[in-house]
Structure formats: structure tokens, C-alpha cells
Amino acid sequence: MNHYETVFILNPVLSEVQVKETVTKFEEFLTSRGAEMVSKEDWGLKKMAYEIQNKKSGFYHLFEFKVAGEVLIAFETEFRRDERVMRFLTVSLDKHAISWAERRRAKLKSTKA
């Protein structure tokens, strides 16, 4: 299993309930196919640098997970099919990126406490 990180932007016209349903849908998609969720972050509503689909903002979410490559292809296909997703980007994490992500999560945890 490889280590991946996906950031996706949801349409800003969605209600809070619709956003939670969408995030839960994608999380369940991964876990039902044997993925191990490492981290899940809600970055909230953020202004974008440029308009996407005539929208100036979007709900940003980040998933960090371990999964097999063939499941990742199906996961990205689900993003493309869902109208609520405006953009997404998935990157494979190497050992340096994994350690950086762990430090970032620890720093976030210490600032929230």
C-alpha cells in the first residue's frame, strides 16, 4: 500500500449537511476498499486565487491515507463523477513528505490544545 494525500474543493453553495455527507461518502469509499485513513482535515471555506465554475471560494478538505493503486484510480473517478467536487489533487507521499505531514499534524494538535 502506498501513502497518498488528496486535497479537494467542494462547491461553496452546499449546506453544512451536504458538505458532511460528501466528505463521509469519500471517506467510506476508501475505508470500504481497505484503505487506512491516516488523517482527515477540514480547512473550511477559503477564497480561491481564481474562479472555478464561476465561484470565488470553496470548502477545502484534506485526506491522508494508505491504499493500493487500483483503489486510488477508482477513488479519483468518483471525484470526477461528483458534481459537488470542483477540484481535487492527489499526490503520492515519499518518506520526507510523510515526516513533514506528521510534524505539521503535531504542530496543529499542539496549537489547538
Curated annotation (Swiss-Prot):
Binds together with bS18 to 16S ribosomal RNA. This is Small ribosomal subunit protein bS6. It comes from Flavobacterium johnsoniae (strain ATCC 17061 / DSM 2064 / JCM 8514 / BCRC 14874 / CCUG 350202 / NBRC 14942 / NCIMB 11054 / UW101). Belongs to the bacterial ribosomal protein bS6 family. GO terms for biological process: translation. GO terms for molecular function: small ribosomal subunit rRNA binding; structural constituent of ribosome. The gene is rpsF. SUPFAM superfamilies: Ribosomal protein S6. The keyword Iron does not apply. Gene3D superfamilies: 3.30.70.60. Keywords: Ribonucleoprotein, Ribosomal protein, RNA-binding, rRNA-binding. It holds the Pfam family Ribosomal_S6. InterPro entries: Ribosomal_bS6, Ribosomal_bS6_sf, Ribosomal_S6_plastid/chlpt, Transl_elong_EF1B/ribsomal_bS6. GO terms for cellular component: cytoplasm; ribonucleoprotein complex; ribosome.
